[in-house]
């Protein structure tokens, strides 16, 4: 890409030099007028005014030797011009031969048909006549009308005003191209930096320091070392006595270089069992029954105790109630653990003293024929869990006070101190 830009800039500079130095050779006759673009020689005086004269063909045509023809003095006071073809010798030598022969200006035309003009270079020491270069078709046209005094040739200097505007336009074009190249370069650089940044952000390996901190052993025998096998599962090379093996938390072993490269540059799990190498060795493996969330992030909803079917007679001690129901609620709501423990201690003695009264109350409730289902069941919601028959009213009143945010609408007027649901 840089080479293409350099070539374009060179071409533009060449066009600028062509536009600035380009003049005109005009062929004027009573019937025709032809204009041709020319380029002044670097070593000859510049054409500052319009030069008018009759053109003559050089003999020899390439003017590499002294010219045999001499210019004739025109009665109209015009200057004699000589027409020379390119090739055979240098431009400077041609112009010097034309100057020695007495011509006032030399017109050199190309010997090959091209679409551009070539600059004529040489030593300007002693050169006093003007010299211009034209294309091949212009030289052939001038050669056709050479020697005719009725056909005049005019050398017109470059238009200074047009040249300045052309120079400004060329400079603007070059600046626009340069800005475009800079923008393209910035875009490519931005994409390159984005690619590097994305590849860095998508790094999936482990820290080198963490990998190096993993334990390693020296291989002695596969059976003694309890290794994965007799060969490394990464490079498939057999273990040799004395090889350093890296031990992952899953107890699989690999060559140190192999598994270090795997963990640092590629993935963070064991290549064999896919266990995460960032875990500790005593951490239990994840199974299909492993919950997605740990117990510390468990839901804060009330955990109910499974009870036997309705109608069965089961006795629960206060200690059993406190160690099951309250313990499960504390696990589901860690924020209220200390508060529940304090209230539980306060209710320890009332529970023991009111055990018998609770038993009698349960019997009386059966004799009165109250329904064994709570109003919550009657509303079509979650099933009501029956409470133990020997539990005291104090336990339920305390629990109802502690769990007011969860069970405010659970108990009805049946859950009183003297009538509890079965």
UniProtKB/Swiss-Prot annotation:
Domain PA residue range list: 81-146
Membrane topology, record value: Single-pass type I membrane protein
Signal sequence range: 1-22
PANTHER family linked to this entry: RING ZINC FINGER DOMAIN SUPERFAMILY PROTEIN-RELATED, RING-TYPE DOMAIN-CONTAINING PROTEIN
Protein name in the entry: Receptor homology region, transmembrane domain- and RING domain-containing protein 3
Lineage: Eukaryota, Viridiplantae, Streptophyta, Embryophyta, Tracheophyta
Topological domain spans for side Cytoplasmic: 190-422
Location of this chain's protein in the cell: Prevacuolar compartment membrane; Protein storage vacuole membrane
InterPro entries, sorted: E3_ligase_sorting_rcpt, PA_dom_sf, PA_domain, Znf_RING, Znf_RING/FYVE/PHD, ZNRF4/RNF13/RNF167_PA
Disulfide bonds listed in the record: 64-89
Residue ranges, compositional bias (Polar residues): 349-368
Keywords recorded for this protein, A-Z: Disulfide bond, Glycoprotein, Membrane, Metal-binding, Protein transport, Signal, Transmembrane, Transmembrane helix, Transport, Vacuole, Zinc, Zinc-finger
Transmembrane segments: 169-189
Stretches for region Disordered: 344-368
Alphabetical list of CDD domains matching this protein: PA_C_RZF_like (cd02123)
Segments on the Lumenal face: 23-168
Entry function: Involved in the trafficking of vacuolar proteins. May function as a sorting receptor for protein trafficking to the protein storage vacuole (PSV).
Recorded coiled-coil stretches: none
Molecular-function annotations in GO: zinc ion binding
Zinc finger (RING-type): 232-274
GO cellular component assignments: endomembrane system; protein storage vacuole membrane
Carbohydrate-modified residues: 31
A Gene Ontology biological process term: protein transport
